[in-house]
Design a protein with these regions (language model features):
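Conserved, well-ordered active-site substructure
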Residues: 320, 331-377
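Cap/lid and interdomain-hinge subdomains that line or gate substrate/regulatory clefts
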Residues: 1-3, 25-29, 63-74, 78-190, ...
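Short acidic, glycine/serine/threonine-rich loops at helix termini
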Residues: 15-17, 85-88, 113-121, 182-187, ...
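Conserved, well-structured core segments that form the ligand-binding/active-site neighborhood
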Residues: 121-271
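Short beta-strand segments
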Residues: 5, 42-44, 76-77, 103-108, ...
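Glycine-rich, highly charged phosphate/nucleotide-binding loops
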Residues: 51-65, 306
């Protein structure tokens, strides 16, 4: 069995979509399932949304289970722009699993995300000049790899694949194109912890002689009633909500006051009543961040929790067949609130956008995507029309 440890639920779902592409049966869970029958076990730790201390505690627990499972391949799925506690988690995993070497390959060249001369570039421009600088939880203030990882002197080396590789320590890969990914995939060995973004994981699968399945492109058949949760503060997300509302998709905005640490149960109740009415009338509804809401770290946590409460309330009042969520921390909060701890990918709708079956509920499917990714085009996504 192969195992991927993801620090975020949408990252786990993205790997699940790749598993489908390569004909692998995948299971997404929050713990090490020693009895899993899957080809690929994907463990969502949700550590990106935790404090570093809490994240390390989760990693310790996961590594204990991994020692018993003994996977044939272990890959740590990280955020491609290195948000979260990436270095601290990798250093701890090295210690616990007794792996002297680690390789971090964050680049996704297919999405314009590259590492050149120790600098992270997005479509050729320094990362900190992009919308990632406005991330409420992990704002990007620098494009330097060492600064992004908060690395101290001697913690890491940033190297191209053709440079001599050290016998111990952590290497961050310079990558300009897919050929560089292929070259890095040939440097793996049993003493090396491998971490990276989705594109590198796909490259590793191909290095293992796996090939993408040839499938016909088809529209996603999604069944109402459907709830879409737009909890990401990214400008693309806000623009998307505005566009679908203009196109006639029912949108229920969270009252701005609920973005604060408000305990106004009456206001929450009124919002839910209005949302349920839209769902009943239209068969679908999106709950979204109010345009006037702040998107700093404190508000992000409140918004995430409110979105999860709203999802649980709506699911308790209506039978939902589809829940579509953007943003990994929001998705994880919703899953916890709904008591969901195991998912099985069934359809990759677009890069990073994966539809999954919920264990124990044949009627319900979850579709997840990272906040910085795009939803599929409307003509491939009939629910959005």
């Amino acid at each position: 069995m192969m195992v991927v440890i993801a620090d975020d639920l949408t990252g786990a779902a993205e790997i699940g979509g790749l598993a489908l592409k390569y004909g692998l049966m995948a299971e997404i869970t929050t713990t090490v399932n020693l009895h899993s029958k899957a080809d690929l076990l994907i463990i969502d730790t949700d550590t990106r949304s935790l404090s570093q201390t809490a994240a390390k505690a989760v990693i310790r627990e996961i590594c204990t289970g991994l020692k018993e499972l003994q996977p044939t391949l272990l890959f740590k799925k990280i955020d491609s722009v290195l948000r979260g506690h990436v270095l601290a988690e990798i250093q701890l995993q090295q210690e616990l699993l007794q792996l002297p070497k680690a390789l971090i390959v964050p680049a996704n060249p297919g999405l314009g995300r590259t590492v050149v001369n120790s600098t992270y570039l997005l479509n050729g421009q320094p990362l900190h000049q992009s919308s990632f600088s406005q991330d409420p939880e992990f704002p990007v203030y620098s494009s330097g790899i060492r600064e992004l990882l908060q690395a101290k002197d001697g913690d890491i080396q940033v190297l191209p694949h053709y440079a001599p590789q050290p016998g111990a320590g952590i290497v961050v890969a310079e990558v300009q194109n897919s050929s560089d990914l292929v070259a890095w995939s040939k440097t793996l060995d049993a003493d090396k912890l491998v971490a990276g973004a989705a594109e590198f994981f796909a490259t590793i699968l191909e290095a293992m002689n796996m090939r993408p399945l040839v499938t016909k492109e088809s529209s996603a058949i999604l069944h109402p009633p459907a709830l879409m949760i737009c909890g990401s503060a990214f400008h693309k997300s806000r623009a998307f909500v505005k566009k679908i509302e203009q196109d006639g998709f029912p949108v229920s905005y969270m009252p701005a006051a609920l973005g604060d640490a408000s305990t106004d149960t009456q206001l929450f109740q009124l919002w839910m009543e209005a949302t349920l009415l839209q769902l009943k009338q239209e068969g679908k509804v999106s709950i979204a961040i109010h345009p006037q809401m702040e998107d700093d770290k404190a508000h992000a946590l409140n918004i995430r929790n409110r979105m999860a409460e709203a999802a649980a309330f709506i699911a308790g009042q209506a039978t939902l067949h589809e829940i579509l969520i953007e943003g990994g921390s929001t998705a994880a909060a919703v899953m916890r609130k709904l008591g969901i701890d195991r998912l099985y990918p069934t359809m990759a709708l677009a890069p990073g956008v994966t539809r999954m079956r919920v264990q124990g509920n044949k009627e319900l499917h979850l579709t997840l995507k990272p906040g910085s990714y795009e939803w599929p085009p409307l003509d491939l996504f009939p629910l959005m029309q």
